[in-house]
Regions:
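Extracytoplasmic beta-strand/coil segments of soluble accessory domains associated
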Residues: 155-201, 221
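Transmembrane beta-barrel wall of Gram-negative outer-membrane proteins
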Residues: 31, 263-295, 306-344, 352-376, ...
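Outer membrane beta-barrel strand-and-loop segments of large Gram-negative receptors
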Residues: 403-407, 447, 451-455, 547-551, ...
Length: 792
């Protein structure tokens, strides 16, 4: 333990020394930086093109370009003294040109407000320049980025747009159906996905119906989905990252949106908190509020009488979110927010689930007037609890987690689109979990944990090369363990249109699922810390016996691939990945004995609550994307293979889908592009399951060893299972269609009608089979829907 502590101290000292030298070096240049805002709302504009050039020069070689980040921030870190012209462009806004003088201050901070164009000739969902520039100057391995416009061009479920649509069509992502609402990314489980909202971890982002998340699409500013090889700024999970950012409320005027459909009713309100005396100063504040509640309890029996044998659709959920933001003229901002989410699903005589989550926090961006660093931070706390009863008479599974998080991130912007960032994060959580395994043995745990992590990330452009090394230190004092996580990304621009790329690294996490990865139905979604009571010995596939040092989950990622732009509008992305999981933890379904003194001679794998596993995943993801004016096409093919080793045998987990296809098409009709049609077709090869080999009468031996089993009449029927996950379910496929019509009204008000059909050809996709009664429950049937929204 002393060695690990000393090692951490030495690493931190070296890191601080390196940063001190770096800061001193960069502090000698003039810096021009600033923010670009929407003049009508005060919201930062991401992906705007900012160009600076000497005032007397028109030579393109003297131009320096930058792209604004998600908050509208840009920076030119090394500018010589003199007079310059700055041009700001975005395809939806009027161009702005301003002359400036550099040299009077070491740091010059600017502010631009752009007016929206009245008639945008070519809206493509993304800024083409910004997209092309980031392709050449950033590694961007295994990431898909979408804004609100991009999300709205995907087919909606139940006449409501939701980010679930984006997750479902992301390369490398597997969903096990319409119900359950969880996703599996390149061999990882739901517990191994880090999902954040403005820096706050969201423990369960999906509702049980599977069509809807806890996120409000109207509030989403950006969504970044990393399916592997993510850089050192992200940690705490070993499979994927889904980083979601909400916009602020309108700082200039009050407004909102109300919508209704058979699935839910929704309301969004926003406006200024106060009006500053000088409205052009850049100071101000805003609020935004959203609420949605499911209406299926009232609508399903009438509109969908054929669903669930006339019993309606047993889903009920509520989501509430509110945020207040204050901004300064220099670009600094602080936000405070709170949320509440709940979910309930009830299949009579089969299963019942309840969960709720609530919390709040604040985040800030600080732009120091005398420093070139951009500082961001967050602090938050939340509670998540869930209860699941699988069958009548069975004891419920109960899980709860309380968590807090405090983090700071620092960014330096260098020449040629290079950047250094570093940060520190402190988090803590306590978990409470109770369940029974298949032989009715109690599994119960309550833990308290603290995590401390720090990272350093460096991105540099060297000619045709983009190199992105990084390093993360994750300390788990309660275990105790110190994990060093190197990361590396690289890209080589062979030509303007063809790029090779690579990313890889080590990842760790302290969380373990409070449900087995072998469960066929995964409605239950609970959390545990890394188990401390795993078996003393673990047998690897090659027969080697090792002693696990801890119960953390670990992974190594290795990904390579290429990007090719056939034209400005048609692009191909191909990636080959391999993930090695040297250590995973899982609930021990083989537990037969309590872990007490009298069973000391029994092997650990038959009495411990959790077991250690290992495994791997590999595959190929292909994405073909076409975006031009009215037409948007998105085609994805994924091949994947996942295997786990539990110390005895190799087995495929329940999410091991070999082939997955997603085809999406969207077209805007009409002179005003006010009529929209979206289509999505999904195909998935069969998922593995454990077949039933037969049934037998079990004897409870209620009289102990003296029970005369020859004269008793066993009352219990037990199931004899076949080889684990040795069979495959039928293939899954589904077609969804959505049509939208928009009407522009007076005073910038707007009305929209959405008509959708989910599962157009009414495919019977199996969801669950009761082993005893053989009763089949199917995924959702054909579901036509119509919804209306009014924006004011």
């Amino acid at each position: 333990m002393y060695f690990k502590t000393q090692k951490l101290k030495n690493t931190i000292i070296l890191l601080i020394g390196f940063l001190a030298i770096t800061i001193a070096t960069f502090g000698q240049d003039f810096t021009v930086r600033g923010f670009v805002y929407d003049a009508s709302t005060g919201e930062g504009i991401p992906f705007a093109k900012v160009v600076i050039q000497p005032e007397s020069s028109t030579d393109a070689d003297n131009q320096i370009g930058a792209t604004t980040d998600i908050e509208g921030f840009f920076s030119f870190p090394s500018v010589k003294k003199g007079s310059y012209q700055i041009t700001v462009r975005n395809f939806e806004y009027e161009e702005v040109v301003q002359n400036i003088t550099v040299g009077q201050k070491e740091i010059l901070t600017l502010r631009f407000e752009l007016e929206k164009k009245e008639d945008v000739k070519e809206i493509e969902g993304v800024n083409v320049f910004a997209d092309d520039r980031s392709k050449r100057t950033k590694v961007e391995m295994s990431v898909n980025k979408l804004d609100k416009k991009g999300l709205e061009r995907l087919p909606s479920f139940g006449a409501e747009n939701d980010i679930v649509s984006a997750f479902a069509v992301t390369p490398g992502v597997v969903t096990t159906g319409d119900q359950g609402g969880q996703i599996y990314v390149r061999g990882g489980t739901p517990i191994q996905n880090l999902i954040t909202l403005d820096g706050m971890t969201i423990y369960n982002p999906f509702h049980s119906i599977g069509f809807f998340s806890v996120f409000e699409t109207e509030l989403i500013k950006s969504a970044e989905i990393y399916t592997g090889g993510f850089s050192s700024e992200y940690g705490g999970r070993i499979a994927s990252v889904m980083d979601i950012t909400y916009r602020d409320g309108n700082m200039k005027e009050f407004g909102g949106k109300a919508s209704i459909s058979p699935f839910m009713g929704k309301l969004v309100l926003e406006g200024p908190l106060f009006i500053p005396k000088d409205e052009d100063s850049g100071n101000g504040g805003s609020f935004i509020f959203s609420s949605k509640h499911s209406l299926l309890d009232y609508s399903a029996r009438t509109i969908y009488p054929y669903a669930n044998d006339g019993e309606g659709m047993p889903f009920n959920f509520t989501d509430i979110y509110g945020k207040a933001t204050v901004k300064s003229s220099e670009g600094s901002r602080v936000s405070a927010f709170g949320f509440y989410n709940s979910d309930r699903v009830n299949y009579p005589n089969i299963a019942e689930l309840n969960w709720e989550s609530y919390g709040g926090g604040m985040n800030f961006t600080l732009v120091p007037t005398s420093s070139k660093v951009l500082i961001k931070g967050h602090v938050n706390a939340s509670r998540y609890e869930t209860m699941f009863v699988e069958e009548i008479g069975m004891a419920p599974r109960i899980s709860g987690i309380n968590g807090f998080d405090l983090g700071f991130d620092f960014n330096y912007f260098l020449k040629k689109d290079s950047e250094i960032s570093y940060g520190v994060n402190i988090g803590g959580f306590n978990t409470d979990f109770r369940t029974f395994n298949e032989v009715n043995r109690l599994i119960q745990r309550q833990d308290y944990n603290t995590e401390v992590s720090g990272y350093l990330n460096y991105r540099v452009n060297l000619g045709r090369w983009v190199v992105n090394p990084g390093f993360r230190i994750s300390a788990y004092p309660n275990i105790p363990a110190l994990i060093l996580e190197p990361r590396l990304g690289a890209k080589y621009n062979v030509t303007e249109d063809f790029r090779l790329k690579f990313a890889g690294g080590k990842y760790s996490q302290n969380f373990t699922a409070a449900a087995s990865d072998r469960d066929v139905v995964t409605l239950f979604y609970g959390f545990l810390s890394a188990p401390s009571d795993v078996q003393e010995n673990f047998t690897k596939p090659n027969g080697e016996v090792i002693q696990p040092e801890h119960g953390l989950q670990l992974a190594w990622h290795g990904i390579t691939g290429f990007e090719y732009d056939f034209t400005r509008h048609l692009s191909l992305n191909v990636e080959f990945y391999y993930k090695y999981f040297p250590q995973l933890s899982n609930i021990n379904l083989n537990k037969l004995y309590d872990d007490v003194f009298q069973f000391n001679e029994i092997d650990d794998v038959f009495k411990k609550d959790f077991i250690i596993e290992t495994g791997y995943a590999y595959g190929t993801d292909v994405l073909l994307k076409y975006t031009k004016n009215r037409l948007f096409l998105w085609g994805v093919y994924s091949f994947g293979m996942t295997e786990r080793w539990d110390g005895f045998d190799w087995y495929p987990p329940i999410f091991d889908r070999r082939h997955n296809v997603n085809l999406v098409a969207n077209y805007l009709f009409g002179e005003k592009k006010d009529l929209e049609l979206s289509i999505r077709w999904n195909f998935g090869s069969g998922l593995p399951f454990t077949p039933t080999a037969g049934f037998y009468q079990g004897e409870s031996f209620s009289g102990g060893v003296t029970t005369d089993y020859t004269t008793t009449n066993p009352s219990e029927i037990s199931t004899l299972l076949g080889s684990f996950n040795s069979a495959r379910m039928p293939t899954y496929h589904r077609l969804d269609i959505t049509a939208k019509k928009r009407w522009e009204l007076k005073n910038k008000n707007q009305m929209e009608a959405i008509v959708g059909i989910t599962n157009v050809y009414d495919r019977d996709n199996i969801f669950y089979v009761n082993r005893v009664t053989s009763e089949k429950i199917y995924q959702l049937p054909i579901l036509p829907s119509i919804g209306f929204s009014y924006r004011f």
